[in-house]
């Protein structure tokens, strides 16, 4: 209720995909030129178009206006063919919570506003449940994980119909489980646990294509849980291989290049040719982009609420963002694991770096306009899992051992206070919406 309708990043498009899934259509219709979509409620499409017109001006609207337009659209019956390729190209997995809420509200006679609220509520409940499960399962770094889960942008995304909450929470739970298994002295996983771990690894491929990389966290699980090194190899090859095959098959069926859709002029062939012909210049450009964009990604990922121009977007003060980063790094450094594990630390740090570089490379190839000073299109929310891996790597390294653990609780309180300040500032910025 406190966040403007369809205001989260790309929520307009996530809304249409969630509505489609709520009708049981898991696979979007495919058309020529990477144009995907399908039939959704006429009222749902008109609601999205109404909100989009306000975002593009930009022109503020109120909660009362949203309720009024919802009541008006109740007269718009039937289905209409819609195009929303930026979300229709994704699998339905990350839309199941929102779709369930939308379907329940529609079944109870609710209009588009009630459906939106129901979808948002179920989405945030599932997100919080998964992150709570991850914090319970994690053998170390729980305070860091809680802070990570409760940042203002994370809660803002969770309280929307975006696919991002599940994209964050499911891998976080997998990371926590793999770390617990690494420290668990149990001789072997049960068959049920093996199936559960395998399904989680395969499910990553249905979130985003590059998430197959994150299934590498299973390499941290010791041989003793599989019975033998051979059985471990078979399990990892089967699950990671199945995930890779699934993501390749999905993206072959629903190929999508953001630059073509958003009209940026991105040219993957030209970029690849430039990398081959001028590797040094390409590498320098790549690292220049990292150096320039990564600090912005933290500020954006920790302190931005809203996905459209003001008044529909707010950035927390930079000082607040940097103070939060310092606090979270201090917690990770001081709240060390009971047993220092430098191998796990190095592995997670490396995975975070590789994951980050692959994201930048993907946007360089598929989105960034030719001739741009740095790689464009990246957003802080894309790097949330890289931030989490980096923090957990620091926890496992335990640079200060147990000497500074008495400082962790005060730092945790400071971190929560900073995040509450950011969240309240965002809610206050949207006063124009929820007070009218």
Language-model features: locations:
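Perimembrane helix-loop-helix junctions
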Residues: 177-188, 212-244
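Membrane-lumen/periplasm interface segments of multi-pass, membrane-embedded glycan/lipid transferases
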Residues: 247-336, 436
């Amino acid at each position: 209720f406190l966040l403007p309708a369809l205001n989260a990043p790309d929520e307009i498009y996530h809304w249409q995909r969630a509505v489609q899934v709520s009708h049981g259509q898991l696979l979007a219709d495919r058309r020529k030129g990477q144009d995907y979509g399908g039939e959704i409620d006429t009222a749902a499409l008109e609601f999205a178009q109404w909100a989009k017109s306000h975002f593009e001006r930009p022109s503020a609207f109120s909660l009362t206006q949203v309720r009024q337009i919802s009541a008006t659209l109740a007269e718009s019956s039937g289905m209409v063919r819609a195009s929303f390729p930026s979300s229709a190209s994704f699998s339905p997995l990350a839309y199941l919570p929102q779709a369930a809420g939308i379907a329940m509200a529609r079944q109870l006679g609710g209009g588009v506003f009630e459906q939106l609220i129901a979808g948002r509520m179920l989405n945030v409940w599932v997100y919080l449940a998964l992150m709570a499960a991850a914090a319970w399962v994690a053998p170390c770094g729980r305070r860091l994980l809680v802070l990570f889960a409760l940042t203002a942008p994370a809660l803002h995304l969770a309280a929307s119909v975006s696919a991002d909450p599940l994209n964050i929470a499911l891998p976080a739970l997998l990371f926590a489980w793999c770390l617990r298994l690494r420290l668990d002295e149990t001789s072997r996983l049960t068959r049920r646990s093996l199936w559960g771990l395998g399904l989680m690894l395969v499910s990553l491929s249905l979130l985003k294509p590059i998430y197959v990389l994150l299934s590498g966290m299973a390499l941290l699980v010791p041989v003793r849980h599989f019975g033998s090194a051979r059985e471990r190899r078979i399990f990892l090859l089967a699950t990671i291989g199945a995930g890779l095959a699934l993501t390749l098959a999905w993206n072959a069926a629903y190929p999508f290049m953001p630059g073509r859709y958003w009209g940026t002029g991105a040219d993957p062939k030209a970029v690849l040719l430039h990398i081959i012909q001028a590797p040094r210049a390409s590498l320098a450009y790549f690292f220049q982009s990292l150096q320039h964009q990564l600090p912005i990604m933290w500020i954006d990922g920790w302190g931005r609420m809203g996905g459209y121009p003001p008044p529909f977007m707010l950035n927390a003060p930079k000082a607040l963002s940097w103070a939060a980063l310092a606090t979270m790094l201090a917690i990770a450094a001081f709240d060390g694991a009971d047993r220092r594990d430098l191998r796990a630390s190095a592995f997670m740090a490396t995975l975070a770096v590789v994951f980050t570089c692959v994201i930048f490379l993907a946007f360089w190839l598929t989105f960034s306009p030719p001739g741009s000073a740095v790689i464009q299109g990246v957003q802080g929310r894309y790097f949330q899992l890289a931030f989490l891996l980096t923090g957990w790597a620091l926890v496992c390294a335990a640079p200060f051992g147990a000497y500074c653990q008495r400082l962790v609780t005060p730092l945790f309180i400071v971190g929560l206070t900073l995040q509450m300040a950011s969240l309240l500032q965002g809610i206050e910025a949207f006063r124009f919406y929820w007070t009218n």
